[in-house]
Amino acid sequence: VSPTRAPPLHTNADYGIWTGHTASVYPGGPAATGPPFPGARPGARKLSALSRFHEPQHPDFQRLNASIAFDQRLWPQDVAQSRAHARMLADRGIISSEDRDALIAGLGEVERELREGTFPFRDDDEDIHMAVERRLTEIAGAVGGRLHTARSRNDQVVTDLAMYTRDSARRAQREIRGLMEVVLSRAEQHIDWPMPGYTHLQRAQPVYLGHHLLAYFWMLARDRSRFAFTESESGRLPLGSGALAGVNFDTDRGQVAEALGFESVTPNSIDGVSGRDFILDYLSAAATCSTHLSRLGAELVLWSSSEFGFCELPDAWSSGSSIMPQKKNPDAAELLRAKAPRVVGHLSAFHGVMHALPLTYNKDLQEDKEHLFDSVDTLELTLAAAGGMLAGVRFNRERMRDAASDEMIAATDIADLLVKLGLPFREAHGVVAGLVRTAVDSGRALSELSGPEISLVNPLLAEHTQELHSVLEQSSWLESKVSEGGTSLARVREQLELARAELGDRDE
Protein backbone atom coordinates (compact mmCIF):
# COMPACT_ATOMS: atom_id res chain seq x y z
CA VAL A 1 0.00 0.00 0.00
CA SER A 2 1.50 3.33 -0.99
CA PRO A 3 0.96 5.91 1.76
CA THR A 4 -1.22 8.80 0.78
CA ARG A 5 0.29 12.27 0.76
CA ALA A 6 0.18 14.00 4.11
CA PRO A 7 -2.92 16.18 4.56
CA PRO A 8 -2.84 19.94 5.06
CA LEU A 9 -1.52 21.47 8.24
CA HIS A 10 -3.53 21.06 11.42
CA THR A 11 -3.57 22.92 14.66
CA ASN A 12 -3.64 21.31 18.06
CA ALA A 13 -7.23 22.46 18.30
CA ASP A 14 -7.95 20.39 15.18
CA TYR A 15 -6.62 17.36 16.99
CA GLY A 16 -8.87 18.22 19.93
CA ILE A 17 -6.60 16.75 22.57
CA TRP A 18 -4.52 19.52 24.10
CA THR A 19 -7.11 22.29 24.08
CA GLY A 20 -10.19 20.24 24.92
CA HIS A 21 -11.95 21.55 21.81
CA THR A 22 -14.06 19.34 19.60
CA ALA A 23 -12.06 17.82 16.77
CA SER A 24 -13.80 18.77 13.54
CA VAL A 25 -11.46 16.83 11.25
CA TYR A 26 -9.48 13.66 11.46
CA PRO A 27 -5.96 14.37 10.17
CA GLY A 28 -5.08 11.77 7.60
CA GLY A 29 -8.56 10.26 7.51
CA PRO A 30 -12.19 11.01 6.66
CA ALA A 31 -13.44 14.41 7.65
CA ALA A 32 -17.05 13.76 8.46
CA THR A 33 -17.82 10.07 8.58
CA GLY A 34 -16.87 9.29 12.16
CA PRO A 35 -17.96 10.56 15.54
CA PRO A 36 -16.47 13.82 16.82
CA PHE A 37 -13.91 12.23 19.13
CA PRO A 38 -11.99 13.05 21.19
CA GLY A 39 -13.67 16.41 21.61
CA ALA A 40 -16.98 14.70 22.21
CA ARG A 41 -16.96 12.72 25.42
CA PRO A 42 -17.23 9.00 24.79
CA GLY A 43 -19.44 7.09 27.13
CA ALA A 44 -17.80 4.91 29.76
CA ARG A 45 -16.90 1.57 28.26
CA LYS A 46 -18.54 -1.48 29.69
CA LEU A 47 -16.23 -3.83 31.52
CA SER A 48 -15.78 -7.32 30.18
CA ALA A 49 -16.14 -10.15 32.67
CA LEU A 50 -12.52 -10.95 31.78
CA SER A 51 -11.29 -7.43 32.52
CA ARG A 52 -8.39 -6.86 34.89
CA PHE A 53 -10.17 -3.83 36.34
CA HIS A 54 -13.15 -3.34 38.66
CA GLU A 55 -14.39 -0.08 37.20
CA PRO A 56 -14.49 1.42 33.73
CA GLN A 57 -12.15 4.12 32.52
CA HIS A 58 -13.10 7.68 33.30
CA PRO A 59 -14.32 9.47 30.16
CA ASP A 60 -11.67 12.17 30.53
CA PHE A 61 -8.97 9.51 30.74
CA GLN A 62 -10.36 7.94 27.59
CA ARG A 63 -9.98 11.28 25.85
CA LEU A 64 -6.47 11.77 27.21
CA ASN A 65 -5.44 8.24 26.28
CA ALA A 66 -6.91 8.11 22.78
CA SER A 67 -4.71 8.85 19.78
CA ILE A 68 -7.13 7.96 17.00
CA ALA A 69 -7.80 11.61 16.13
CA PHE A 70 -4.24 12.00 14.88
CA ASP A 71 -2.73 8.53 14.39
CA GLN A 72 -5.31 7.43 11.85
CA ARG A 73 -3.11 8.90 9.15
CA LEU A 74 -1.00 5.76 9.74
CA TRP A 75 -3.70 3.52 8.27
CA PRO A 76 -1.82 2.79 5.00
CA GLN A 77 1.19 1.57 6.95
CA ASP A 78 -0.95 -0.33 9.45
CA VAL A 79 -2.88 -2.18 6.76
CA ALA A 80 0.29 -2.95 4.80
CA GLN A 81 2.14 -4.40 7.77
CA SER A 82 -0.94 -6.37 8.86
CA ARG A 83 -1.17 -7.93 5.43
CA ALA A 84 2.53 -8.87 5.46
CA HIS A 85 2.22 -10.18 9.02
CA ALA A 86 -0.75 -12.40 8.13
CA ARG A 87 1.11 -13.92 5.19
CA MET A 88 4.16 -14.61 7.33
CA LEU A 89 2.06 -16.26 10.06
CA ALA A 90 0.57 -18.63 7.49
CA ASP A 91 3.92 -19.35 5.85
CA ARG A 92 5.34 -20.30 9.26
CA GLY A 93 2.36 -22.53 10.03
CA ILE A 94 1.20 -20.33 12.90
CA ILE A 95 -2.21 -19.77 11.30
CA SER A 96 -3.92 -21.71 8.52
CA SER A 97 -3.94 -20.63 4.90
CA GLU A 98 -7.73 -20.32 5.15
CA ASP A 99 -7.38 -17.88 8.04
CA ARG A 100 -4.74 -15.98 6.08
CA ASP A 101 -7.02 -15.65 3.07
CA ALA A 102 -9.88 -14.44 5.25
CA LEU A 103 -7.61 -11.88 6.91
CA ILE A 104 -6.22 -10.63 3.59
CA ALA A 105 -9.71 -10.29 2.13
CA GLY A 106 -10.95 -8.48 5.22
CA LEU A 107 -7.98 -6.13 5.21
CA GLY A 108 -8.74 -5.34 1.59
CA GLU A 109 -12.24 -4.24 2.57
CA VAL A 110 -10.87 -2.21 5.49
CA GLU A 111 -8.41 -0.55 3.13
CA ARG A 112 -11.17 0.30 0.66
CA GLU A 113 -13.30 1.92 3.36
CA LEU A 114 -10.38 3.94 4.68
CA ARG A 115 -9.40 5.13 1.22
CA GLU A 116 -12.95 6.07 0.27
CA GLY A 117 -13.69 7.73 3.61
CA THR A 118 -16.48 5.33 4.56
CA PHE A 119 -14.67 3.59 7.41
CA PRO A 120 -17.07 3.50 10.41
CA PHE A 121 -14.95 5.00 13.18
CA ARG A 122 -16.36 4.67 16.70
CA ASP A 123 -15.80 6.80 19.75
CA ASP A 124 -14.25 3.84 21.59
CA ASP A 125 -11.56 3.34 18.92
CA GLU A 126 -8.51 4.15 21.00
CA ASP A 127 -6.07 4.18 18.10
CA ILE A 128 -5.81 3.24 14.45
CA HIS A 129 -4.49 -0.25 15.30
CA MET A 130 -7.52 -1.16 17.41
CA ALA A 131 -9.86 0.49 14.91
CA VAL A 132 -8.49 -1.62 12.05
CA GLU A 133 -8.60 -4.83 14.11
CA ARG A 134 -12.10 -4.09 15.36
CA ARG A 135 -13.40 -3.44 11.85
CA LEU A 136 -11.54 -6.46 10.47
CA THR A 137 -13.27 -8.66 13.04
CA GLU A 138 -16.64 -7.18 12.10
CA ILE A 139 -15.98 -8.05 8.45
CA ALA A 140 -14.15 -11.39 8.73
CA GLY A 141 -15.54 -12.67 12.01
CA ALA A 142 -13.61 -14.17 14.90
CA VAL A 143 -10.65 -14.95 12.65
CA GLY A 144 -9.83 -11.24 12.84
CA GLY A 145 -8.58 -11.85 16.36
CA ARG A 146 -5.84 -14.12 15.00
CA LEU A 147 -4.08 -11.22 13.30
CA HIS A 148 -2.56 -10.04 16.56
CA THR A 149 -0.79 -13.36 17.10
CA ALA A 150 2.95 -12.80 17.64
CA ARG A 151 2.45 -9.05 17.62
CA SER A 152 2.08 -6.31 20.24
CA ARG A 153 0.86 -2.80 19.73
CA ASN A 154 4.32 -1.80 20.97
CA ASP A 155 6.10 -3.22 17.93
CA GLN A 156 3.12 -2.55 15.69
CA VAL A 157 3.05 1.21 16.23
CA VAL A 158 6.80 1.70 15.93
CA THR A 159 6.72 -0.25 12.67
CA ASP A 160 3.99 2.01 11.32
CA LEU A 161 6.04 5.02 12.37
CA ALA A 162 9.25 3.71 10.83
CA MET A 163 7.44 3.19 7.52
CA TYR A 164 5.83 6.63 7.72
CA THR A 165 9.11 8.34 8.58
CA ARG A 166 10.96 6.50 5.83
CA ASP A 167 8.36 7.51 3.25
CA SER A 168 8.31 11.11 4.53
CA ALA A 169 12.10 11.31 4.34
CA ARG A 170 11.97 10.10 0.74
CA ARG A 171 9.39 12.76 -0.13
CA ALA A 172 11.50 15.41 1.58
CA GLN A 173 14.49 14.47 -0.56
CA ARG A 174 12.41 14.78 -3.73
CA GLU A 175 10.92 18.10 -2.69
CA ILE A 176 14.29 19.51 -1.65
CA ARG A 177 15.71 18.45 -4.99
CA GLY A 178 12.93 20.37 -6.71
CA LEU A 179 13.81 23.50 -4.76
CA MET A 180 17.51 22.98 -5.52
CA GLU A 181 16.65 22.95 -9.23
CA VAL A 182 14.82 26.27 -8.86
CA VAL A 183 17.75 27.82 -6.98
CA LEU A 184 20.23 26.58 -9.58
CA SER A 185 18.11 27.91 -12.43
CA ARG A 186 17.83 31.37 -10.85
CA ALA A 187 21.58 31.40 -10.13
CA GLU A 188 22.34 30.59 -13.78
CA GLN A 189 20.00 33.35 -14.94
CA HIS A 190 21.69 35.95 -12.71
CA ILE A 191 25.25 34.69 -12.65
CA ASP A 192 26.84 38.12 -13.32
CA TRP A 193 24.46 40.52 -11.57
CA PRO A 194 26.45 42.55 -8.98
CA MET A 195 24.96 43.09 -5.55
CA PRO A 196 26.26 43.92 -2.09
CA GLY A 197 27.17 41.11 0.25
CA TYR A 198 26.34 41.86 3.87
CA THR A 199 27.66 41.28 7.35
CA HIS A 200 25.64 42.59 10.31
CA LEU A 201 23.16 43.71 7.62
CA GLN A 202 25.72 46.35 6.59
CA ARG A 203 27.22 46.45 3.11
CA ALA A 204 30.45 44.49 3.32
CA GLN A 205 31.81 43.24 -0.02
CA PRO A 206 30.33 42.97 -3.50
CA VAL A 207 29.26 39.59 -4.84
CA TYR A 208 27.30 38.29 -7.79
CA LEU A 209 23.65 37.41 -7.26
CA GLY A 210 24.31 33.98 -8.76
CA HIS A 211 26.98 33.39 -6.13
CA HIS A 212 24.63 34.45 -3.35
CA LEU A 213 21.81 32.18 -4.52
CA LEU A 214 24.15 29.21 -4.76
CA ALA A 215 24.73 29.49 -1.02
CA TYR A 216 21.16 28.25 -0.58
CA PHE A 217 21.77 25.44 -3.06
CA TRP A 218 24.51 23.98 -0.86
CA MET A 219 22.45 24.39 2.30
CA LEU A 220 19.70 22.39 0.63
CA ALA A 221 22.17 19.79 -0.60
CA ARG A 222 23.18 19.13 3.00
CA ASP A 223 19.51 19.00 3.99
CA ARG A 224 18.89 16.35 1.37
CA SER A 225 21.78 14.31 2.75
CA ARG A 226 20.30 14.51 6.24
CA PHE A 227 16.99 13.14 5.01
CA ALA A 228 18.82 10.37 3.16
CA PHE A 229 20.39 9.46 6.50
CA THR A 230 16.94 9.53 8.11
CA GLU A 231 15.61 7.21 5.42
CA SER A 232 18.46 4.80 6.11
CA GLU A 233 17.93 4.94 9.88
CA SER A 234 14.23 4.14 9.36
CA GLY A 235 15.15 1.00 7.44
CA ARG A 236 15.19 -1.58 10.26
CA LEU A 237 11.98 -3.50 10.96
CA PRO A 238 10.85 -3.46 14.62
CA LEU A 239 7.92 -5.85 14.06
CA GLY A 240 8.57 -9.16 15.79
CA SER A 241 9.95 -7.53 18.91
CA GLY A 242 6.62 -8.07 20.65
CA ALA A 243 5.90 -6.07 23.77
CA LEU A 244 9.62 -5.92 24.59
CA ALA A 245 11.15 -9.41 24.93
CA GLY A 246 10.28 -10.95 21.58
CA VAL A 247 7.43 -13.37 20.87
CA ASN A 248 6.76 -17.03 21.65
CA PHE A 249 6.51 -18.05 18.01
CA ASP A 250 9.14 -18.89 15.42
CA THR A 251 8.36 -15.97 13.14
CA ASP A 252 10.27 -14.88 10.05
CA ARG A 253 11.04 -11.22 10.57
CA GLY A 254 13.16 -11.13 7.44
CA GLN A 255 10.17 -12.10 5.31
CA VAL A 256 8.11 -9.24 6.71
CA ALA A 257 11.03 -6.83 6.36
CA GLU A 258 11.41 -7.68 2.69
CA ALA A 259 7.68 -7.39 2.05
CA LEU A 260 7.55 -3.92 3.63
CA GLY A 261 10.73 -2.60 2.05
CA PHE A 262 12.96 -2.63 5.13
CA GLU A 263 16.67 -3.26 4.72
CA SER A 264 17.03 -5.35 7.88
CA VAL A 265 15.43 -6.06 11.27
CA THR A 266 16.18 -4.46 14.61
CA PRO A 267 18.76 -6.70 16.34
CA ASN A 268 17.47 -6.10 19.88
CA SER A 269 13.79 -6.35 20.82
CA ILE A 270 14.07 -3.90 23.73
CA ASP A 271 15.64 -1.26 21.53
CA GLY A 272 13.20 -2.16 18.78
CA VAL A 273 10.09 -1.14 20.73
CA SER A 274 11.57 1.74 22.72
CA GLY A 275 13.74 3.45 20.11
CA ARG A 276 12.52 6.56 18.33
CA ASP A 277 15.87 7.79 17.05
CA PHE A 278 14.62 7.81 13.48
CA ILE A 279 11.92 10.31 14.47
CA LEU A 280 14.51 12.51 16.15
CA ASP A 281 16.59 12.21 12.98
CA TYR A 282 13.66 13.40 10.87
CA LEU A 283 12.85 16.24 13.26
CA SER A 284 16.48 17.33 13.34
CA ALA A 285 16.75 17.33 9.55
CA ALA A 286 13.42 19.15 9.26
CA ALA A 287 14.44 21.75 11.84
CA THR A 288 17.71 22.49 10.02
CA CYS A 289 16.01 22.62 6.62
CA SER A 290 13.28 24.89 7.99
CA THR A 291 15.94 27.18 9.41
CA HIS A 292 17.52 27.43 5.96
CA LEU A 293 14.13 28.26 4.46
CA SER A 294 13.61 30.90 7.13
CA ARG A 295 16.85 32.62 6.11
CA LEU A 296 15.72 32.64 2.49
CA GLY A 297 12.35 34.02 3.53
CA ALA A 298 13.95 36.72 5.68
CA GLU A 299 16.14 37.90 2.81
CA LEU A 300 13.21 38.01 0.40
CA VAL A 301 11.28 40.11 2.92
CA LEU A 302 14.17 42.58 3.13
CA TRP A 303 14.98 42.60 -0.57
CA SER A 304 11.36 43.18 -1.61
CA SER A 305 10.97 46.18 0.71
CA SER A 306 10.97 49.69 -0.74
CA GLU A 307 14.13 50.43 1.22
CA PHE A 308 16.06 47.70 -0.61
CA GLY A 309 14.10 47.30 -3.83
CA PHE A 310 16.23 44.37 -4.93
CA CYS A 311 13.30 42.24 -6.04
CA GLU A 312 9.55 41.99 -6.42
CA LEU A 313 7.70 38.92 -5.22
CA PRO A 314 5.14 37.31 -7.55
CA ASP A 315 1.53 38.31 -7.03
CA ALA A 316 0.58 34.67 -6.51
CA TRP A 317 2.76 34.58 -3.40
CA SER A 318 1.84 37.99 -1.96
CA SER A 319 -1.15 39.52 -0.22
CA GLY A 320 -2.76 42.92 0.10
CA SER A 321 -3.91 45.02 3.01
CA SER A 322 -7.45 45.24 4.34
CA ILE A 323 -7.11 49.01 4.70
CA MET A 324 -4.12 50.20 2.62
CA PRO A 325 -4.81 49.60 -1.09
CA GLN A 326 -1.21 50.18 -2.17
CA LYS A 327 0.28 47.38 -0.10
CA LYS A 328 1.89 44.24 -1.48
CA ASN A 329 2.86 42.19 1.53
CA PRO A 330 5.46 39.38 1.49
CA ASP A 331 3.33 37.04 3.58
CA ALA A 332 4.67 33.83 2.03
CA ALA A 333 8.26 34.85 2.73
CA GLU A 334 7.34 35.92 6.25
CA LEU A 335 5.73 32.56 6.92
CA LEU A 336 8.84 30.74 5.71
CA ARG A 337 10.61 32.72 8.40
CA ALA A 338 7.99 32.05 11.06
CA LYS A 339 7.42 28.33 10.50
CA ALA A 340 11.01 27.37 11.35
CA PRO A 341 10.72 27.80 15.14
CA ARG A 342 7.57 25.68 15.05
CA VAL A 343 9.55 22.73 13.68
CA VAL A 344 12.51 23.45 15.94
CA GLY A 345 10.05 23.41 18.83
CA HIS A 346 8.85 19.94 17.89
CA LEU A 347 12.45 18.70 17.90
CA SER A 348 13.11 20.23 21.31
CA ALA A 349 9.82 18.99 22.75
CA PHE A 350 10.33 15.41 21.60
CA HIS A 351 13.87 15.39 22.93
CA GLY A 352 12.21 16.33 26.21
CA VAL A 353 9.82 13.38 25.92
CA MET A 354 12.67 10.94 25.29
CA HIS A 355 14.97 12.41 27.92
CA ALA A 356 15.55 9.97 30.81
CA LEU A 357 12.65 7.76 29.66
CA PRO A 358 13.08 4.28 31.21
CA LEU A 359 13.09 1.27 28.91
CA THR A 360 11.02 0.06 27.24
CA TYR A 361 7.62 1.30 26.09
CA ASN A 362 5.91 4.10 28.00
CA LYS A 363 2.77 5.98 27.07
CA ASP A 364 4.95 9.08 26.76
CA LEU A 365 5.89 7.73 23.34
CA GLN A 366 2.38 8.43 22.09
CA GLU A 367 3.52 12.06 21.88
CA ASP A 368 5.91 11.18 19.06
CA LYS A 369 3.18 11.31 16.44
CA GLU A 370 1.98 14.88 16.71
CA HIS A 371 5.52 16.24 16.77
CA LEU A 372 6.37 14.16 13.71
CA PHE A 373 3.16 14.67 11.76
CA ASP A 374 3.05 18.44 12.15
CA SER A 375 6.73 18.73 11.24
CA VAL A 376 6.15 16.68 8.08
CA ASP A 377 3.16 18.81 7.10
CA THR A 378 4.93 22.08 7.85
CA LEU A 379 8.11 21.17 6.01
CA GLU A 380 6.34 19.90 2.90
CA LEU A 381 4.20 23.03 2.71
CA THR A 382 7.10 25.44 3.19
CA LEU A 383 9.31 23.63 0.67
CA ALA A 384 6.56 23.91 -1.93
CA ALA A 385 6.02 27.58 -1.08
CA ALA A 386 9.72 28.39 -1.26
CA GLY A 387 10.06 26.82 -4.70
CA GLY A 388 6.96 28.45 -6.12
CA MET A 389 7.83 31.86 -4.76
CA LEU A 390 11.51 31.86 -5.74
CA ALA A 391 10.71 30.71 -9.27
CA GLY A 392 8.59 33.84 -9.81
CA VAL A 393 10.75 36.47 -8.09
CA ARG A 394 11.75 39.37 -10.35
CA PHE A 395 15.15 40.77 -9.40
CA ASN A 396 16.03 44.44 -9.98
CA ARG A 397 19.45 44.51 -11.59
CA GLU A 398 19.84 48.30 -11.49
CA ARG A 399 19.02 48.63 -7.80
CA MET A 400 21.41 45.83 -6.89
CA ARG A 401 24.20 47.22 -9.07
CA ASP A 402 23.79 50.72 -7.65
CA ALA A 403 23.87 49.40 -4.09
CA ALA A 404 27.04 47.49 -4.92
CA SER A 405 28.66 50.65 -6.35
CA ASP A 406 29.33 52.11 -2.91
CA GLU A 407 33.10 52.58 -2.89
CA MET A 408 33.27 51.89 0.81
CA ILE A 409 32.76 48.20 0.17
CA ALA A 410 36.11 48.20 -1.64
CA ALA A 411 37.91 48.89 1.66
CA THR A 412 39.23 45.34 2.01
CA ASP A 413 40.51 45.45 -1.56
CA ILE A 414 42.46 48.64 -0.77
CA ALA A 415 43.96 46.94 2.27
CA ASP A 416 44.97 43.99 0.09
CA LEU A 417 46.61 46.44 -2.34
CA LEU A 418 48.74 47.76 0.51
CA VAL A 419 49.64 44.20 1.49
CA LYS A 420 50.86 43.61 -2.06
CA LEU A 421 52.93 46.79 -1.69
CA GLY A 422 54.61 45.30 1.38
CA LEU A 423 52.58 46.36 4.43
CA PRO A 424 51.45 43.80 7.02
CA PHE A 425 47.70 43.32 6.75
CA ARG A 426 46.94 44.61 10.23
CA GLU A 427 48.80 47.85 9.46
CA ALA A 428 47.11 48.09 6.07
CA HIS A 429 43.74 47.65 7.79
CA GLY A 430 44.46 50.68 9.98
CA VAL A 431 45.55 52.79 7.03
CA VAL A 432 42.35 52.10 5.13
CA ALA A 433 40.26 52.79 8.24
CA GLY A 434 41.90 56.23 8.39
CA LEU A 435 41.22 56.77 4.70
CA VAL A 436 37.56 55.86 5.19
CA ARG A 437 37.31 58.25 8.14
CA THR A 438 38.74 61.08 6.04
CA ALA A 439 36.20 60.46 3.28
CA VAL A 440 33.26 60.16 5.69
CA ASP A 441 34.24 63.30 7.62
CA SER A 442 34.49 65.31 4.41
CA GLY A 443 31.34 63.85 2.89
CA ARG A 444 33.11 62.58 -0.22
CA ALA A 445 33.72 59.28 -1.95
CA LEU A 446 37.10 57.60 -1.63
CA SER A 447 37.86 58.32 -5.29
CA GLU A 448 37.35 62.05 -4.65
CA LEU A 449 40.15 62.35 -2.10
CA SER A 450 43.16 64.32 -3.27
CA GLY A 451 46.73 63.10 -3.39
CA PRO A 452 47.80 65.25 -0.42
CA GLU A 453 44.86 63.96 1.65
CA ILE A 454 45.82 60.40 0.85
CA SER A 455 49.45 61.16 1.64
CA LEU A 456 48.50 62.44 5.08
CA VAL A 457 47.00 59.04 5.80
CA ASN A 458 49.77 56.99 4.18
CA PRO A 459 52.51 58.23 1.83
CA LEU A 460 52.95 54.79 0.25
CA LEU A 461 49.34 54.73 -0.88
CA ALA A 462 49.68 58.25 -2.29
CA GLU A 463 52.46 56.98 -4.52
CA HIS A 464 50.08 54.43 -6.06
CA THR A 465 46.94 56.46 -6.73
CA GLN A 466 46.51 54.86 -10.16
CA GLU A 467 46.37 51.39 -8.63
CA LEU A 468 44.04 52.77 -5.95
CA HIS A 469 41.57 54.11 -8.52
CA SER A 470 41.70 50.79 -10.39
CA VAL A 471 40.77 48.99 -7.18
CA LEU A 472 37.81 51.36 -6.76
CA GLU A 473 36.22 50.14 -10.01
CA GLN A 474 33.34 47.72 -9.31
CA SER A 475 34.48 45.09 -11.77
CA SER A 476 37.83 44.95 -10.01
CA TRP A 477 36.21 44.27 -6.64
CA LEU A 478 34.27 41.31 -7.98
CA GLU A 479 36.85 39.72 -10.23
CA SER A 480 39.64 39.94 -7.66
CA LYS A 481 37.99 37.21 -5.56
CA VAL A 482 39.76 34.36 -7.33
CA SER A 483 39.96 31.83 -4.48
CA GLU A 484 38.07 28.57 -4.84
CA GLY A 485 34.44 29.13 -3.87
CA GLY A 486 34.79 32.90 -4.34
CA THR A 487 32.64 35.34 -6.28
CA SER A 488 34.70 35.92 -9.43
CA LEU A 489 32.80 34.80 -12.51
CA ALA A 490 35.20 31.97 -13.21
CA ARG A 491 34.73 30.63 -9.69
CA VAL A 492 30.95 31.03 -9.81
CA ARG A 493 30.88 29.06 -13.06
CA GLU A 494 32.84 26.33 -11.31
CA GLN A 495 30.23 26.31 -8.55
CA LEU A 496 27.46 25.99 -11.11
CA GLU A 497 29.18 22.94 -12.57
CA LEU A 498 29.52 21.43 -9.11
CA ALA A 499 25.84 22.10 -8.47
CA ARG A 500 24.81 20.40 -11.70
CA ALA A 501 26.99 17.44 -10.78
CA GLU A 502 25.40 17.30 -7.33
CA LEU A 503 21.98 16.92 -8.90
CA GLY A 504 23.24 14.51 -11.54
CA ASP A 505 25.13 12.26 -9.13
CA ARG A 506 22.04 11.81 -6.97
CA ASP A 507 19.39 11.82 -9.65
CA GLU A 508 16.10 10.44 -8.39
Language model regions located:
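Generic, well-ordered alpha-helical scaffold segments in large soluble proteins
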Residues: 85, 106-113, 135, 139, ...
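Charged, flexible cofactor/metal-binding loops and thiol motifs
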Residues: 161-166, 173, 181, 188, ...
